[in-house]
């Protein structure tokens, strides 16, 4: 596992340089879900794949930017699903973006996730590693240095409501309105990584990306985005649910499956579960 962490650190330093100097324009290609790929997406993906190819403990990888699993080392122990540059469309307006890694054993599903890592590329570069606990590192003088352990409070103050609002179910809209009426502050940039990172560092709150009329199964991808952050939130003392159960109990049938998801401290997630139980 240690060599995987070092590989992610190496990729993060290279992607940092790419963000600072690379072309932010669109490519002529689409990814597996039909989104037009930015040149930064393709370049970031290649950086990570090229580094992972040299790690004997990695059996296979799959990128959000690619359709299929890439087999690497037959005797490897770990499978890695990753989003090379989540929120890449925010780079050209100079907002924070990130990379997300889910590390699995045996097969790609929630029950087999053993660790996760995400990297935030903002004014500073920070890396959060989740195994049995949640540790944050910061890039200082070219090296990642341990800063702190992360723990959530029982109740937070931030609300980050995602997806297209005119496609929300009425009860979901009422839930979000009620949370704001209770004094929560809006914190939503459109980047999953910095928004979830902020809630973790500020002690708690709610990030929601529900099923909607146009996307009943949600938009965020299980293996690449949802499960890695679910592990982080649970190990930090919070919860991650799909509205009814832990997202780490969700079954994956295809590597690019999506799911509705809610991440937060216990008070907010219990509120979500209560509302969804009554209305669905």
From Swiss-Prot:
Mg(2+) 1 binds at residues 64, 83, 85. The keyword Transmembrane helix does not apply. Its cofactor is Mg(2+). Keywords: Carbohydrate metabolism, Cytoplasm, Hydrolase, Magnesium, Metal-binding. It catalyses: beta-D-fructose 1,6-bisphosphate + H2O = beta-D-fructose 6-phosphate + phosphate. Substrate binds at residues 86-89, 188, 219. The keyword Lipid metabolism does not apply. Gene3D superfamilies: 3.40.190.80, Fructose-1,6-Bisphosphatase, subunit A, domain 1 (3.30.540.10). This is Fructose-1,6-bisphosphatase class 1. GO terms for cellular component: cytosol. Its EC number is 3.1.3.11. GO terms for biological process: fructose 1,6-bisphosphate metabolic process; fructose 6-phosphate metabolic process; fructose metabolic process; gluconeogenesis; sucrose biosynthetic process. Its main location: cytoplasm. It comes from Aliarcobacter butzleri (strain RM4018). Belongs to the FBPase class 1 family. InterPro entries: FBPase_C_dom, FBPase_class-1, FBPase_N, FBPtase, SBPase. HAMAP family: FBPase_class1. GO terms for molecular function: fructose 1,6-bisphosphate 1-phosphatase activity; magnesium ion binding. Pathway: Carbohydrate biosynthesis; gluconeogenesis. Homotetramer. Binds 2 magnesium ions per subunit. It is found in: Cytoplasm. Mg(2+) 2 binds at residues 83, 86, 225.
């Amino acid at each position: 596992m240690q060599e995987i962490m070092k590989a992610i650190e190496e990729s993060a330093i290279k992607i940092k340089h790419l963000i600072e100097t690379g072309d932010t324009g669109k490519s002529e290609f689409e990814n597996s879900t039909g989104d037009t790929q930015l040149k930064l997406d393709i370049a970031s993906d290649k950086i990570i794949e090229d580094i992972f190819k040299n790690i004997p403990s990695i059996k296979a990888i799959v990128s959000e930017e690619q359709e299929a699993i890439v087999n690497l080392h037959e005797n490897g122990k770990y499978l890695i699903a990753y989003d090379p540059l989540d929120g890449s469309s925010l780079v050209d307006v100079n907002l924070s973006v990130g990379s997300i890694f889910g590390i699995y054993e045996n097969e790609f599903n929630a029950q087999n996730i053993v660790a996760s890592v995400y990297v935030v590329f903002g004014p500073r570069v920070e890396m959060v590693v989740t195994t049995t606990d949640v540790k944050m590192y910061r890039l200082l003088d070219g090296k990642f240095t341990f800063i702190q352990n992360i723990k959530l409070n029982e109740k937070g103050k931030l609300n980050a409501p995602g997806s297209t609002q005119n496609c929300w179910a009425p009860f979901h809209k009422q839930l979000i309105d009620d949370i704001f009426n209770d004094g929560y502050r809006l914190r939503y940039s459109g980047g999953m990584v910095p928004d979830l990172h902020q809630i973790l560092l500020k002690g708690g709150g709610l990030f929601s990306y529900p099923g909607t009329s146009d996307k009943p199964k949600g938009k965020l991808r299980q293996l690449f985005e949802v499960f890695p952050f679910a592990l982080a939130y649970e190990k930090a003392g919070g919860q991650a649910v799909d509205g009814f159960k832990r997202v780490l109990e969700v079954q994956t049938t295809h590597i690019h499956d999506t799911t509705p998801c809610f991440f937060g401290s216990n008070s907010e997630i219990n509120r979500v579960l209560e509302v969804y139980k009554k209305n669905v």
